[in-house]
A protein has these predicted regions:
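A short beta-loop-alpha structural element at the N-terminal edge
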Residues: 7-21, 32, 81
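Conserved GNAT-fold acetyl-CoA-binding loop/helix
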Residues: 27-49, 85, 97-99
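Active-site rim helix/loop that mediates acceptor-substrate recognition in acyltransferases
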Residues: 38-61, 66-67, 72, 77
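Conserved GNAT acetyl-CoA-binding A-motif
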Residues: 123-124, 152-163
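Conserved acetyl-CoA-binding loop-helix of GNAT-fold acetyltransferases
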Residues: 131, 137-150, 173-177
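Glycine-rich phosphate/pyrophosphate-binding loop shared by adenosine-nucleotide-utilizing enzymes
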Residues: 4-6, 69-75, 124
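Conserved acyl-donor/pantetheine-binding loop and adjacent beta-alpha core of acyl/acetyltransferases
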Residues: 82-124, 191
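C-terminal "cap" of GNAT-fold acetyltransferases
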Residues: 158-161, 165-172, 177-178, 188-207
Length: 207
């Protein structure tokens, strides 16, 4: 892993609940329309989703530690292994239905399916990069991207890709500064209306 002024390490099972909380906090404006009145279930659902990604989705997570190992200040997920997409989808649906009920689960599953991504064997896929609000602008996001790219190289990936919403200008500037370039776009009337996301940009970088 690259050297940084703070500790970047691979996440452990004990970190999954904290990662889930970070993700919900970091994307709160996107999760509210998805979970609605069941927002109180969002962290529990996300924790189980992160666990499913780790066990079935070929995803590894990296975290930035605070002063104590249990204190997580930032996190990122990177898909570098093989994913059992069928089992992953069934697992997520079971979690959603159990915690939200059938109708809300169907709605949540539809919105959570965006942006669409098809795995490529030679490419790593980065997701859910989040930094706690009070620790932003300290280089943690760059450090996590650097570590994720390094891990991807260890798994012989040739490129790394990620999605970002067209209105997330700080993230776009960060990725462009790191050498990511736009490869394609997805337009969704559904996410445009309900999440305020008109387009999803797919960015790639050669490793």
């Amino acid at each position: 892993m690259p050297k940084n002024p703070f500790v970047v390490r691979l996440a452990e099972p004990r970190d999954e609940a904290v990662i889930a909380g970070l993700v919900v906090e970091g994307f709160l404006d996107k999760f509210r329309p998805i979970f609605g009145r069941r927002m109180d279930q969002s962290v529990k659902i996300m924790e189980k989703w992160v666990r499913l990604e780790h066990s079935l989705g070929g995803v590894s997570s990296l975290v930035v530690e605070g002063h104590a190992p249990a204190e997580i200040l930032a996190s990122i997920g990177v898909r570098i292994g093989n994913s059992d997409d069928g089992a992953l989808t069934r697992g997520l649906w079971k979690v959603l239905r159990r915690n939200l009920g059938y109708t809300r689960a169907s709605w949540a599953a539809t919105l959570l399916s965006y942006p669409r991504y098809t795995a490529i064997s030679y490419e790593a896929y980065i997701e859910r990069l989040v930094v706690t609000h009070e620790h932003r602008h300290q280089g943690m996001a760059c450090a996590l991207l650097e570590a994720a790219e390094s891990l991807s190289r260890e798994f012989d990936k040739e490129t790394v890709g990620l999605h970002v919403s067209d209105d997330n200008l700080p993230a776009l500037r960060l990725y462009e500064a790191r050498g990511y370039k736009e490869s394609s776009r997805q337009h969704s009337l559904l996410t445009s209306y309900f999440l305020g996301i008109r387009e999803w940009l797919y960015l790639q970088k050669e490793l």
